[in-house]
Each structure stands twice: as C-alpha cells, then as structure tokens.
Amino acid sequence: MVFARCCTVLLLALVAWPAGAQSPRISRPQATMPLLIAPAAEQPVQLQRARIEGEVQAGIAQTRITLEFHNPNRRVLEGELQFPLADGQQISGFALDINGELRDAVPVPKDRGRQVFEEIARRGVDPGLLEQTAGNQFRLRIYPLPAGGSRRVQLVIREPLAFAGQGWQWTLPLQFAAGAAAVELELQAPATTSAGAAPFRINAGRLHWQGKGAQLPAQLQWSLPAARQAQVQVAPWQDGHYLLAQLPVSTSSTPRTLPSEIGLLWDGSGSAGQRNRTREFALLDRYFAAMGDGTVALTVLRDRAEPMRRFRIRAGNWSELRAALQAVRPDGASALAQWQAQPSVKEYLLVSDGLLTYGPEQLPTLAPDQRLFAISSAGARTDSTRLRGWSESHGGRFVALGKDVESDVRELLSSPLDVQVDAGRGVQDVVIDRRSEAQGWLWLHARLAADGVPMRVRVGGGEWEALPATQKSNDGELLAGLWAQARLQQLAADRRGNREAMQRLSQQFGLVGPDTSLIVLETLEDYLRYAIRPSGKLRAEYDARFAVQLADRAAADRQRLDEVAARWKERQQWWNRSWPKDTPPQAKGRALEVASADYAMESAPVAMLAAPAPAAPPAPAPMAAAEQHMEASSARSRRSASASNKALDLITVTGGRVATPAAANEGELGIQLAAWQPDSAVARRLRQGPASQLYDRYLAERDAHADSSAFFLDVADLLLEQGQRELALRVLSNLAEMDLDNRHLLRVLGYRLMQADAPALAVPVFEQVLAMGQEEPQSFRDLGLALAAAGKPQQALAPLYQVVVRPWDSRFDGIALIALDELTNLVARSTPRLDTRSIDPRLLQAMPLDLRVVLSWDADNSDMDLWVTDPNGERAYYGNRLTYQGGQMSQDFTGGYGPEQFSLRNAKPGKYKVEANYFGSRQQLVTGATTLMLRLTTHWGTAKQKDQMVTMRLKDRAETVLVGEFEVR
C-alpha cells in the first residue's frame, strides 16, 4: 500500500540523569526513543494514559507497562510502536485490549506470527503482534486503531539489576510514558527499602505517583540497599524446579597481560556507519597503551573478509593501524563469522554491532588458548546476545561501550573469571550469567529435577564451595524465565545450528527473540484456523476442538497428495502424445476460441491433451496502467467463462496417442538473450569516467542513496559489465543490510546472486527468506533451486517437495507441478542416485523437454505474463495454454512472484520468441520497479541441458518486453 502521509509520535529520548538519583552511575549504552508510527494518519495518534507498575525482589525487576492510544482521525489505522530495550532487558509478556479486556499474547514462530497478522489484518479484525527486529529493537503492530477510538496494550519487561556501591541499581523505563497526557506509577521494593528523592522517593518499599508525562524526569534511578552475600532461590514451575544463585566474587583491578600478537576483526559493512568510531578509537588507544609493543593482524569483515594485513605497535603507538581503520569506507553485508583463525594470534578483538546479515553464523574454530573479546558502540542496535554468546564461549567477554571509557577499558583488560560447577545428578542445563561480573557478581541458573540437589562451585582456581542453603520462592515463573533467558544467551553462540532449540525454548517460556514473537488474536476461530494455542479462558475449548481439526487436516493432506498425483498423471499424458509439426490448419468459425479458453488442464484433461488447437489470435496488448488491474481481472473472467463452456464440443482431434514416448529433438538449439543495461540517472552518471574508478565514484554517491535498493542493483550491474565481479557482489550484498526483516528485499538479493552465478552465496539468503515466511511456496522453491545449483542436490529435494505437498493459498495453484518438474529433473540427472524414499513414487517420472521457459518476478500483488511465440506464429500465453504443436503454458499467476512455465517436448525447427507482458503492481515496490527473472533452458532433463538466465527491471507501468529467442535448427 502506498501511503500519502506518515505521522510519528516521539515518546521520549533518555538524555540525562535525574538530580535525585542516589547511586553511583553505571555506564551502559542508553536506549534511544520509542516511535509510534501510524501510516496515513492526518493527525498524530495520541498516548492518552500510561500506567507503569514495577516490582523488585532479590535483584530482579519486573515492570508492567500499560499504554492507551487514541486515534483522533476519521479513518481506521494500523499502529506500529518501535522501541529499543537496554542490554539485559527481556520482554516476558504482552497483552492487547480485545472487547475491553486485556488478552495475553502467546508465543509463535516469528515467520508464522507475521503471516497470521497480515492475513487477519486484511480481514479487518483485531490482531496484535510483538516481534524483535534488529539487535535489541522491537516492533509492536496493532490493528485496528478505530476511528475516534482507543486501544490498550500492555508490555511486561524483566531484567536482572546491576549491583554498584551498596545496592541494586533500579532504572525505570520511563521512555514509554513521557508523552502521555496522564501517567500513574505504582512501585514496590523490599519492605525495608527507602531510596530516592521526593516526589519519587520509595518509602517503606512503596511509591505511588500520578501526573502528566511532561512532569516526569528524563530518568529515574534508585539504589536499593542490599547485603553483599550469596543468595540461592529455588521454585517449581511446569516440568521441574528452577534455581537462581547470586554469588559475590572478587574482582581484580590489575590488568591482564596482553599477548604480543592480537587479531583485530573490524566490521566494515554498511551498518558500521552507525557505530561510534570516536569511542572505539578511545578504547583502542588505552588497549594498545597497555599492550606496549606487539603485532596486530587486521581483518576487515564485509560480505567476505578482506585479505589480512599486519601492523606493528611500538610503545603503544598504533597510528599506522589507526589510519588504515579510518580509511575503511562502510560498504557491503556483514559476514562476521567468515574469517580464518591464525595459530599465532592468541587474542581476537571483534569490533562490530553483531548484526550478522550474511554467510555462516558459527565462528571458525579457535584453539583452547585463543580468546575472543567483542566490542560494540552501536547502543540498542547491537545484537548483544550474539556478541556475548560468541565471546563468552571463547574465553572472553562482551564490552558495550558507554560514556565512561575508563570503565570500559577496565572491563576489557580484566581477565574473565574461571568458573567451574560440580552438579549432582538431577541438575540440568547449568548456565553462568557473567553480565555483572565486572561489578563483582555471578548469577548461576539451573534446571533441577527436585529442589534439594547439591551443587558446588569453584571460582578463579580457588576452593570448591557448596552453594548456601536454598530459599524456597513462590515465583517459579520468574526463575524459570530467567533461566530460559540465560539459556538462550548460551545457545546464541551458534544461532543457526541451535535455531530449533532456541525457538522451542522461546515458545515454552513466552520470550520474544530472533525467531519467536508474541501474538494476540480476536476469536477462537482465528486461533483454530492458524493452529495457535491461546491463553486463558479460550484454551480448554481450543484443545477440544483442535483434536478434531487435526484428524480432518490429516485427511485433507492425503487428499491433496492424491490430487497432485492425478494432475501429474495428466501432464504425463500430454508428454506421451505426439503433436503435429506441420503448418496448422486455418481456424474456422468459433473453433478459434478453443485455444483462447483460460481453463485449467485438470478440469478437462483427456479432451484437452488429445486435441491440438488451431493457431490462437494474438494475445491482447497491455492495458493502460490506470485500468489494468480491474480490466485484467474482469476480462479474464469473461474469457474463461465464454470459452471453456464451448471447449469440449468444438475440439477436433488431429493428434493421436502413441504407444512409446515421442523422441526428443536431436538438432541444435540456440539461445539469444536481449541485452539490458541500467539506465537511471545515477547509472548514467557513474558510467562517466574510467572503469577503474567506478567503485570510487559509487562510494562518493553511496550515502546519498543508502536507502535505495535500486541504486545498489544498478551499481552492481555496472560493475558486472566491467568485469569487477567481487566488487559487484559486495555492492549487491548491501541489500541484506537495508531492512533486516524485509524478505522481499532478500529474495531480490538471492535472485541476483543466482544470476551472478553465486549460488553458494544465495543459499543462506534464501534460508533467511524461508525462516521469515513459510506461507509462500516460492520461498521453498527458491531455496531448493539454489541448493541444487550449489551442488547439494540431496538437500534440495526437501524444500522442493514441500512445494508439492503443502497446502497453499489458491493464488499459488499450479506451482506444485512446476516444482515437480524441477524435482524429477534433479533426481534423474544426479549422480550418485539420490535418496527419494520420502517422495511419493507416483511423482518421480522425469519428463525431458526440448524447450523450457520459466518466468518469475520479485513483487507480490503484481501481474506478469509469459508469452512464447513459435515458428507457426502461434503465441502461447494465459489465454492459449496449449498450442497446435504441443507447447504447454502453466496456470496464470496474477497475484505475484510467479512462476509461469512454458514446456515443449519436441520443438519444431525455427525461431521462438520469448516476451514478458507486465500488467503492473498493486503494491509499493521494495526496489522501485518490478524485476523479472527468466530462465531459458534447452534440452531440459538431458545430458545436453543448457540454462541461461536473464534479469530485467521494469517500469511501474504496463509494458511488454522482448526477453530472448530460441532457435531450433
């Protein structure tokens, strides 16, 4: 949808410390301001009320934030609240106002949540979705915000507090309430606590305050007095008991001895421009001063690691290295794990925001004596979970740079404590949380079979000590959630390898994370339709009805597979027939309409396959953009109704069945593709000057076009024209950095990588697309084709088969047969033979072809048609799906993406013209123009198979383009 206007509400920026704060300052990056975005709003949506309820016990804070938004506009809106959280904060709950009552959200896989939200919002009912985006950024989507009405939402945030001085430091997340017309604070701390200054003083453990958002200070922080002694709590919850041990430990002020050679992994990707280089250099100044003399092995990380360079450090002087870092221009995607460890390097510093957008997710193997420290200055845009998981699993720590560089240096130069745990039987999944280690605390989490299991701990090579006696807690959900949060942190060291485990954990404990979101639906029918188990009152009825639904679904799956097998048999009948290769007879009377009937093959298989049709009239010319969508739809409906009603009566049989398969064409088949070059104003400007300086000219233009995907596509094409492939791939990879949650952009990136003959790079991109949304069969097909092209045919079978067997929305009808063509071709041509035991044997016959053309495109809600004109002058298209000589066109895709396929088993000699007819798009395009991808194949399914692929970007209007030609001699 194209919006004419977008209003945003700035809720608050955390910019200062309050005068009444009574605790030492703890330096940690502050969150930036939340934004409420209401597209198409003429007046800004108002935050009417905010209620913040906070409670602290044993160093753990839980805050419940209830917000009421009012829409003063005369139209229904969708609202999107974007907000960051500080490092260590975790969302543990979300609720949405449904018919006046707050209904708790339930966890769902992230891609599933997005799919369900968008489908339900299109029906105009009440979903709410909370998801994590980049780093520690979150997005809450609410629909509808009624015209002239209000909606309430509630967030629950949990965090372990930092210890400083003589107590726990509690900072209230006021940023959510600052813009509210009315605010209420209700806080509870241990009963003996008194802290802070009026009017925000906690007395006897309580604080109640009412007022306006404008009266709130920029930040409220209290120091809650607490004894520095070990405390152990155990509580039951669901499947077991959960333990939290808070252990004071000694910290050393003596810096550790640095090795004489260190490795510096410097993130030079496009997102590096948002880091604070001044803070990073200030930290490195002190680090190299402590190092004195030594060597630095520098590796700049982008879409691929640049060649390593070595620099000498003399008496702390690192000016040469500093100049090299200053010369790094941010560009390309972030392949943070794609580098080679050097045996001589004993310590690595990774300076990055942790937002891995490219390549593998598991770090290279480090030797036991090699450490990794991670450093970020990107604030809330940091993926602190990943960086902490990587560094702590490799003997180092994560340092989030704040305003106090001396504190950050002390943390970087101190040695992480060696902590060992001796757990008895019945103790599972012990996790050590080191986030407060610099303040002299360790938090130990574990899952227990019972509450009396003994455990011992040894810190820093000291004596083994038994944990103190446990205190029984009544808040099992809180302790279990903290354990799950720490366990997720541990698994994040290999996020891709542990994705399923992380998703199960997040769903079990209701945590929002990289792969799990929280969703609220309006009706029980919605929960049943999407197989999402609700919370609260709806759960019992859901469980009873869902058991019946499961049995029905299994029967429907079997029926669907039978239907696909029947349609595949019909295609075999078409393939086994011989078709005339002479000049077609002149059409007489109304028989001309037969070839134009827009009927599906499966509706009249035998008659259709037995009868080659006369030559069809020319396909209609493209319509004007202003009329195209409505007229295309109605014209197709009229054409289908009038022609298909007559089809069976008017067919004259001129072809015959053959007992043996017809022979494929043995002659020469050539392909000639139409040339295409980017012709934007920027592309024309960049072409001027020497080719050797093209990349430099691009860098000079980059900042001005950083939000334009079309810019990066144009530049990549120009670099490929000049033979600068590696730089072209770098520029192309910027699409992965632009919008981390935009699968449409990633799909375009994957297609362009395939066109550039880089399928190994395309595979992880298409894996990301699939992880973001499994509701579109193209996501499975794209991954399967990329795996096959990357030399992984066995792995390619699974996603291709999913296209065949899964139920899809009706707008994707026909894609199953196209994927089956690709799957059976892969099986037939692979050596050694593939394992096909999981595939229905009815679906395994391969059908080689002389000619195959497949058209797909990168925009949803857009219509494009494949036209193939043969030597008879007959055009195969959506209205003429079966030609006189047996050319077959697949079903028409009018809703987006495609694919559409033309197949011809035995090609008549002559020229075949391939065109794409674009009807236009009904949505705002991520690249500013629709991109078509057309694959032309000769001798499909044989040893002589030859593929060529062309990509073109079309203007956002109706047009017909010549893509290429086949010639059969």
Q: Residue ranges of each PLM-predicted region?
A:
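Von Willebrand factor
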Residues: 257-351, 356, 381-383
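VWA/integrin I-like adhesion module and closely mimicked acidic/polar interface patches used
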Residues: 352-401, 409-412
